[in-house]
Amino acid sequence: MADERQAALDKALKKIEKDFGKGSIMRLGDNSNLEVETVPSGSLALDVALGVGGYPRGRIVEIYGPESSGKTTVALHAVAEVQKRGGTAAYIDAENALDPAYATALGVNIDDLLLSQPDTGEQGLQIADALISSGAIDIVVVDSVAALVPRAEIEGEMGDAHVGLQARLMSQALRKLSGTINKTKTIALFINQIREKVGVMFGNPETTPGGRALKFYATVRLEVRRAEQIKDGTDVIGNRTRIKVVKNKVAPPFKRAEVDIMYGQGISQTGELLDMAVEKDIVDKSGSWYSYGEDRIGQGRENAKQYLADHPDMMAEVNQRVRAAYGVGDEEAAATKATETKTDAPKDKDKGKTKAKDKPADVTPGQIELAPDKSAK
């Protein structure tokens, strides 16, 4: 009986492969690439919170939060990390608000960044589809879902009712995009705003525009919120920002990362490194004093951050120990291997797809000392 069932299964598998092509069905264990390929987020703390060392390739990521919370900053750091590893990035600026000078300050190479400022939501999503389908793009950022206005609303009169148009647009687009995103290993990063649901008496009244489709299709959803202001005397020089992993299909969710977003500098590498080093007892905190080994590195967090920034050798040593403690890879080695992988990539019809052993760089997270938007979008 078992032999008959196996023979019937083998016959069905052969027919499926004949009808739909080789590789249309396979045993999961036969797939040599079982590890999740990732690209670092640009924040070591966020890489750890994500559980896999960064944003997963071939998946959809949503970043949402209140105004000026740092959503665009987080997205631009991801773009900078992709470019740092030799990848190609595209930015669909539906809000028409991207600041090239700020993007440059965060480490984005604006000469190589592909930018589109679409007139309608349909146009923006069609452009994203064309870019992703090319197989030559590593990350596409859509800023933002709320600004993807359907053509009917653009061409209509002010005050006209267009119930559910944007939700239908997003649902249709994501049905089409999800398969292509997975095949091309592109990261599709959607920035979203928040709205208040009317009449909610109990529970959280906040929701995100664009319907429910994005919530379902997203592998990772990040909630970005300002926690407190960072001051130098009476001057506000940045924000302490909490990033919560609300949804995660590739690792346990609900982890948090706290980062300093400094005006004009972005996510502070020294700030998160200091916090993580204290958490793992690599740096000792006694009262307001911070010490590393026999060296006192500062009284107060801001002074300790500045000391690390002024002593790159010590910072590199602390960075290495923190990465080892959290089980994430070395940044410089990752960038080097990524460049080698890009050079050695296969040239045949599977161009753009590399084996797991050829892409260790994209599985290890890295950091870059960068910066928040001046309005901390």
UniProtKB/Swiss-Prot annotation:
Tagged with keyword Cytoplasm: yes
PROSITE patterns, alphabetized: RECA_1, RECA_2, RECA_3
TM segment ranges: none
Domain of life of the native organism: Bacteria
Lineage: Bacteria, Bacillati, Bacillota, Bacilli, Lactobacillales
Keywords assigned: ATP-binding, Cytoplasm, DNA damage, DNA recombination, DNA repair, DNA-binding, Nucleotide-binding, SOS response
Intrachain disulfide bonds: none
SMART domains in the cross-refs: AAA
Biased composition (Basic and acidic residues): 339-361
Keyword Amino-acid biosynthesis: no
GO CC annotation: cytosol
Binding sites annotated in the UniProt record for ATP: 65-72
Compartment(s) where it occurs, according to its Swiss-Prot or TrEMBL record: Cytoplasm
Annotated family: Belongs to the RecA family.
UniProt GO BP: DNA recombination; DNA repair; SOS response
The protein's name: Protein RecA
Major subcellular location class: cytoplasm
Molecular function (Gene Ontology), one example: ATP hydrolysis activity
UniProt function note: Can catalyze the hydrolysis of ATP in the presence of single-stranded DNA, the ATP-dependent uptake of single-stranded DNA by duplex DNA, and the ATP-dependent hybridization of homologous single-stranded DNAs. It interacts with LexA causing its activation and leading to its autocatalytic cleavage.
One Pfam family per UniProt: RecA
